[in-house]
Amino acid sequence: MPLPLTEQKMENAMSEVKSKIKHIALSAKDVEATARFFVDVFGMKEVGRFDAQGARGCYLSDGHLNLAILNFKNDAVAGAERGKDWYGIHHIGFQVESLEEIHEKLAAVGSRPRDDVNAALGVGRGHRQESNVEVKYTGPDGIMIDVSQTGWEGTSRALDEQAAPVRTKETQLA
């Protein structure tokens, strides 16, 4: 397992990054319900809709990332290895201000914690609390949603006042 980056090493590593993730596409059975989930729970905004020969869908954004919600009309456009009836992506992570608040919002729309995955990761057992706590939930069409107050290594900390301090090998040994 790689050691956490110090802030200086992080800055140096990020200066070499030439591309940034700006788009994630989800294949969904119900475009409207899936879009409504991300709008209602995470505050994303709808920025476009389309109905083309191979797919229909909408685009959502948080101001930094484009999230396409797609419903494919044929296997060729969806990709033959998956086909038009395959839905999902493994998981999408959201940095939030409060795990308790987002838990209430997720519960209100019928989303439940993935206790199996959370247990396997040790969430709630103390040792994960020392760094990042990622709590997994199930979203529309079984899409796994990951929520965290501290964000992930290698990403900007948009919620700096909520973020835990960066832990280096030196501070862990102190």
Kindly give the residue locations of the regions a language model identified.
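Generic short beta-strand segments
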Residues: 72-74, 118-119
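Secondary-structure boundary/capping motif
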Residues: 28-44, 91, 113, 134, ...
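Core segments of cupin and vicinal oxygen chelate
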Residues: 15-16, 26-73
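Vicinal oxygen chelate
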Residues: 2-5, 11-17, 20-30, 58-61, 80-174
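A short local loop/turn or secondary-structure capping micro-motif enriched for an aromatic residue
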Residues: 75-79, 153-156
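Short, P/G- and charge-enriched loop/turn segments at secondary-structure junctions
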Residues: 78-82, 122-124
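Short linear motifs in intrinsically disordered
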Residues: 46-51, 93-95, 122-128
